[in-house]
């Protein structure tokens, strides 16, 4: 039997918990080194929970993060201020552009002070911490043999703080709906960073009160901390095989090989909005060939995310934290600690502004 867990975050957390009960089969005995070498290295490495060489989790479809922009409302701002999409390549660049957008929108109503609009939001704060730190050369959760060491650096954490909490408090960033794509739809932000697998949910219209208008979009890479390495988050789906007799475990491994072969896997990801797991499948040529041969209709937003990531694939490293006890809870602390504080403090500040204080006060 196959244990399957598809997640936009961490399927390895669930698989690790089952493996701790000694219930997962070691898949490495059913794959040759040559076979495993065809898969994206970091995807395979995620399945090695210990230093014993046993492979417990096999990748079947992955995702990472991208930035999507409301092109329709971006263009007037960009033209008026000389801002370019290239400025969004770094986390610090996004902060600078967000400030510029806030000030530009504030200027549209000179008789109303401090009413500028937020530019940006992000779906996953844990990814912001984990990937931001890794881009700057540190692992916030350093894991070895299932044991985690919390590895913080005050200067690096300060950089993350300065590029989320500070702009959030100043009104440059926002997080109002359940997801940031919701905030784009309501016109509360112009751009956000989120999972490639969620691209299909980027809205086709903005709805503000009784007003609604269609929007186009821009897809670009997720930002890198200034001066940091081009590292992106690795998340998505994997399969693990529960322990059984050799015949059933072998049959499960044959299925995994079939399901992840180039053509089959690309057909699946085109319909699920995930990324393929073989190195050779992560190319625009391979994608286009499978789409044409099988007459597949792919959502245009999903296709644009695929091509954006595939064009940069060979220059990108993917990263996810190793599995450890309570790793899911640890990620949730990162997800909510800074975000909740920023929201609570911002609400308090907005109330003070409503009572007559200026934003700077």
How would you label these PLM feature ranges?
Residues 158, 169-170, 207-282:
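Extracytoplasmic/periplasmic substrate-recognition and gating elements
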Residues 26-39, 83-89, 113, 119-120, ...:
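Short, solvent-exposed loop/beta-turn-alpha elements that line the ligand-binding surface or hinge
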Residues 11-19, 196-213:
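A ligand-binding cleft/hinge motif common to bilobed small-molecule-binding domains
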Residues 1-10, 186-195:
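Alpha-to-beta junction loops
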Residues 95-102, 143-177, 217, 222:
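Glycine-centered hinge/linker elements that transmit conformational signals in sensory
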Residues 47-67, 92-149:
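Extracytoplasmic/periplasmic solute-binding protein
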Residues 2-66, 214-223:
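Hinge/lid segment of periplasmic solute-binding proteins
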Residues 296-361:
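Conserved C-terminal helix/tail region of periplasmic/extracytoplasmic solute-binding proteins
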């Amino acid at each position: 039997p196959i244990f399957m867990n598809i997640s936009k975050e961490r399927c390895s957390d669930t698989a690790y918990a089952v493996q701790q009960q000694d219930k997962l089969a070691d898949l490495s005995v059913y794959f040759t080194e040559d076979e495993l070498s065809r898969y994206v290295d970091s995807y395979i490495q995620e399945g090695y929970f210990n230093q014993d060489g046993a492979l417990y989790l096999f990748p079947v479809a992955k995702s990472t993060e991208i930035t999507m922009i409301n092109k329709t409302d971006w263009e007037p701002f960009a033209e008026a201020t000389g801002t370019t999409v290239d400025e969004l390549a770094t986390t610090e660049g996004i902060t600078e552009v967000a400030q510029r957008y806030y000030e530009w929108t504030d200027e549209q109503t000179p008789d109303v002070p401090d009413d500028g609009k937020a530019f940006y939001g992000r779906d996953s704060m844990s990814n912001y911490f984990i990937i931001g730190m890794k881009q700057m050369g540190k692992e916030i959760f350093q894991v070895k043999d299932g044991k985690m060491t919390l590895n913080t650096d005050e200067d690096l954490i300060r950089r993350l703080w300065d590029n989320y909490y500070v702009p959030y408090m100043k009104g440059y960033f926002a997080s109002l709906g359940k997801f940031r794509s919701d905030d784009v739809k309501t016109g509360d932000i112009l751009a956000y960073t989120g999972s490639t697998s969620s691209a299909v949910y980027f809205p086709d219209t903005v709805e503000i009160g009784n007003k609604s208008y269609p929007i186009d979009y821009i897809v670009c890479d997720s930002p890198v901390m200034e001066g940091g390495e081009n590292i992106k988050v690795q998340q998505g789906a994997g399969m693990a095989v529960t322990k059984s007799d050799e015949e059933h475990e072998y049959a499960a491994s044959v299925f995994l090989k079939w399901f992840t072969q180039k053509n089959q896997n690309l057909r699946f990801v085109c319909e699920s909005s995930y990324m393929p797991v073989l190195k050779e499948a992560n190319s625009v040529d391979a994608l286009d060939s499978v789409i044409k041969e099988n007459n597949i209709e792919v959502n245009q937003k999903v296709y644009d995310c695929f091509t954006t990531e595939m064009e940069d694939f060979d220059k990108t490293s993917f990263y996810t934290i190793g599995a450890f006890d309570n790793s899911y809870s640890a990620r949730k602390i990162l997800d909510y600690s800074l975000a909740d504080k920023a929201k609570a403090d911002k609400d308090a500040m907005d109330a003070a502004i409503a009572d007559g204080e200026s934003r700077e006060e």
